């Protein structure tokens, strides 16, 4: 009689190709003889809204707002009771722009402010904010401008901001720990990915520093060097500085909401992964958080990714296996094709499980 094992799948998205839910579903097809459980997960970046809404059983609603180039769009967020789930990239995401439209200097987070206004009008007072995937490096200035326009200049600093700070709770879901400015700041580390030239990086970093200095003088405190202030182009800073937000690991926040540790108890194996796995994976990305919890529960954990670098470091960290799903020599263009990724992911999962349960993958 064949023994059936419980396999827990908890994948981050494969950026530009498959969402978290899609990756998990396809991988599970390679485990057809096993009992599988697929979790839709995110660390606060891409796919955050879908994953968190599912975990918190929130309804997705939408409103009119503006993208990073101030073009009118409809953007979604989650709402359950008095809690709103906001994915900043829904309003000012890099994925909303064509590559030739990226404007690292002019991109604005104004639309995020519009999402907040709509959620507040619907009664939201508790907020989970997913930071990541934005096209902006404005330190949250655009978001604050939208709130300023809504509240009016007379009320903004005197009554509106204090109410947001004192009557609402703000939880930032992110695993980014960079400060607002400096060598490890939002501009230096993330702006090049958003199309910034070296000269623009210098300009943006100086602009963020001026923004923080002005706020510190006016408010008497400075959050610019706090871990996570540089997340989402400095939106993290704006929430920390102006709203008194609390930064939490996006991955841990979601895994707790999914009761992940309980789900682990009867699992024979956990399989996690992301589009590209390397030593950065071990610096707080979602697969690392999955690994930590699996190790604590004494459940083996394997990693699958579209690309794998620093494999020995990944194995040394505790992954039982770390595999690239694509064969050697496959072009980057082919790797990003959805059907190619689906086929290779399902096949690699099947091969991994065969090896694992035949005891070919040792501790």
Language-model-derived ranges and their functions:
Residues 2-131, 135-363:
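N-terminal loops that bind phosphate or other acidic moieties
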């Amino acid at each position: 009689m064949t023994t059936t094992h419980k396999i827990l799948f908890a994948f981050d998205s494969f950026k530009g190709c498959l969402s978290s839910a899609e990756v998990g579903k396809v991988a599970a097809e390679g485990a057809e003889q096993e009992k599988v459980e697929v979790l839709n997960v995110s660390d606060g970046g891409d796919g955050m809204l879908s994953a968190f809404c599912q975990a918190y059983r929130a309804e997705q609603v939408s409103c009119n707002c503006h993208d990073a180039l101030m073009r009118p769009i409809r953007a979604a967020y989650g709402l359950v009771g008095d809690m709103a789930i906001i994915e900043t990239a829904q309003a000012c995401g890099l994925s909303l722009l064509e590559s030739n439209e990226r404007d690292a200097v002019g991109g604005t987070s104004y639309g995020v402010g519009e999402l907040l206004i709509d959620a507040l009008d619907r009664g939201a007072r508790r907020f989970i904010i997913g930071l990541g995937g934005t096209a902006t490096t404005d330190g949250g200035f655009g978001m604050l401008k939208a709130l300023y326009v809504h509240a009016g200049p007379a009320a903004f600093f005197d009554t509106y901001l204090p109410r947001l700070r004192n009557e609402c709770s703000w939880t930032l879901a992110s695993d980014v720990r960079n400060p607002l400015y400096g060598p490890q700041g939002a501009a230096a580390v993330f702006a090049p990915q958003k199309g910034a030239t070296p000269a623009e990086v210098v300009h943006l970093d100086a602009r963020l520093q001026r923004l923080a200095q002005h706020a510190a003088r006016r408010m008497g405190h400075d959050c610019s060097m706090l871990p996570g202030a540089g997340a989402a182009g400095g939106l993290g800073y704006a929430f920390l500085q102006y709203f008194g937000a609390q930064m939490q690991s996006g991955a841990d926040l979601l895994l707790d909401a999914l009761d992940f540790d309980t789900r682990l108890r009867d699992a024979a194996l956990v399989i996690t992964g992301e589009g590209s796995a390397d030593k950065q994976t071990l610096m707080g990305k979602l697969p690392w958080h999955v690994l930590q919890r699996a190790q604590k529960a004494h459940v083996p954990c394997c990693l699958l990714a579209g690309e794998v670098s620093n494999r020995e470091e990944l194995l040394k960290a505790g992954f039982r296996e770390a595999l690239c799903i694509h064969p050697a020599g496959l072009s980057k263009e082919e790797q990003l094709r959805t059907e190619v990724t689906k086929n290779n992911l399902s096949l690699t999962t099947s091969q991994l499980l065969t090896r694992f349960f035949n005891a070919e993958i040792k501790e």
